[in-house]
């Protein structure tokens, strides 16, 4: 089944080239189907790239999804054309009287700041509070996961001596959790961050369950409130060349950055990246949508 997006959204052409089934809003209203309402709070400066990454994954399921893109009203986005935001995005004020089946909160390049120093922290707090009663399940990614763990449970983040950068092996910690249905006992996921949350802090919170971690990269997946909140510290949504682009960008800026681990063939940045995470990335998003959104949401929101 398709994802429903605006016919002029640039990501639509990218997805159609990859045979992802997309449908315009005009076509969707002719069908007698209650599509799942999914909001994506896009905190990334590379908005169009992030749109394509997430739509690619959530569009690869049998479910029909009505996608709403959100941006922060209290933050000026400098890396995206204003007409793109005006045409395709809403603010929290636009949707705060609605209910959603699912919400995705992305990462953001603000992790070296304390949460309270982030200029949109107050607005984000209102959205996360809203999600507790107006969203069936919320998936938090990378910094979005750190923010959610801190806001809802007081779990702190800690600076890393070096950037966690690359593709890392993870172990499943809980075998009988629906989010990990079909997962191998060991799987890969990308990470790209300067801070971490610690397993010991998550284990102190009885409402949280640690699902997967890595000896090298630390915590990757956790859930709270029986799946109403899902936290993914890695980037299972990343495209093949996302880490490559981040590495080249940092090199151009003159930053002292290591080659992303376990990513390039022979660990040589002049060679092609090796994708090890795509199947489990698709499985993570499809399991979230099926077991924690579709199976749990009421027909009438």
Swiss-Prot record:
EC number: 2.3.1.31
Main location: cytoplasm
GO function term, MF aspect, one: homoserine O-succinyltransferase activity
Keywords tagged on the record: Acyltransferase, Amino-acid biosynthesis, Cytoplasm, Methionine biosynthesis, Transferase
Gene Ontology CC: one annotated term: cytoplasm
Reactions performed catalytically: L-homoserine + acetyl-CoA = O-acetyl-L-homoserine + CoA
Location in or out of the cell: Cytoplasm
Highest taxon listed in the record's lineage: Bacteria
Residues holding substrate: 163, 192, 249
A Gene Ontology BP annotation from the UniProt entry: L-methionine biosynthetic process from homoserine via O-succinyl-L-homoserine and cystathionine
Pfam families: HTS
Xref: SUPFAM superfamilies: Class I glutamine amidotransferase-like (SSF52317)
Protein's pathway: Amino-acid biosynthesis; L-methionine biosynthesis via de novo pathway; O-acetyl-L-homoserine from L-homoserine: step 1/1
InterPro entries assigned: Class_I_gatase-like, HST_MetA, MetA_family
Marked site: Important for acyl-CoA specificity: 111
Family annotation (NCBIfam families): metA
HAMAP family associated with the record: MetA_acyltransf
Family: Belongs to the MetA family.
Function: Transfers an acetyl group from acetyl-CoA to L-homoserine, forming acetyl-L-homoserine.
Protein name: Homoserine O-acetyltransferase
């Amino acid at each position: 089944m398709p994802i429903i997006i605006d016919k002029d959204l640039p990501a639509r052409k990218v997805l159609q080239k990859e045979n992802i089934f997309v449908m315009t809003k005009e076509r969707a209203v002719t069908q007698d189907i209650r599509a799942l309402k999914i909001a994506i709070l896009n905190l990334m400066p590379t908005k169009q790239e992030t749109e394509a990454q997430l739509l690619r994954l959530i569009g690869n399921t049998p479910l029909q999804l009505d996608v709403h893109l959100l941006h922060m009203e209290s933050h000026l986005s400098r890396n995206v054309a204003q007409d793109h935001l005006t045409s395709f995005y809403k603010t929290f004020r636009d949707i705060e009287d609605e209910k959603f089946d699912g919400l995705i909160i992305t990462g953001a390049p603000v992790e070296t700041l304390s949460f309270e120093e982030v200029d949109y922290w107050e607005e984000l707090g209102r959205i996360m509070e809203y999600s507790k009663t107006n969203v069936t399940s919320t998936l938090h990614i990378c910094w979005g996961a750190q923010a959610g763990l801190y806001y809802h449970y007081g779990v702190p983040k800690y600076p890393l001596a070096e950037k966690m950068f690359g593709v890392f092996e993870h172990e499943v910690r809980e075998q009988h959790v629906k989010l990990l249905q079909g997962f191998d006992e060991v799987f890969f996921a990308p990470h790209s961050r300067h801070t971490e949350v610690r397993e010991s802090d998550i284990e102190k919170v009885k409402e949280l369950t640690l699902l997967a971690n890595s000896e090298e990269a630390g915590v990757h997946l956790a859930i709270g409130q029986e799946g109403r909140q899902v936290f993914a510290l890695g980037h299972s949504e990343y495209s093949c060349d996302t880490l490559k682009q981040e590495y080249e960008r940092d090199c151009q800026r003159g930053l002292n950055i290591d080659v992303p681990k376990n990513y390039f063939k022979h660990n040589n940045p002049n060679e092609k990246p090796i994708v090890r995470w795509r199947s489990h990335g698709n499985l993570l998003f499809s399991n979230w949508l099926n077991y924690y959104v579709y199976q749990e949401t009421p027909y009438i929101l």
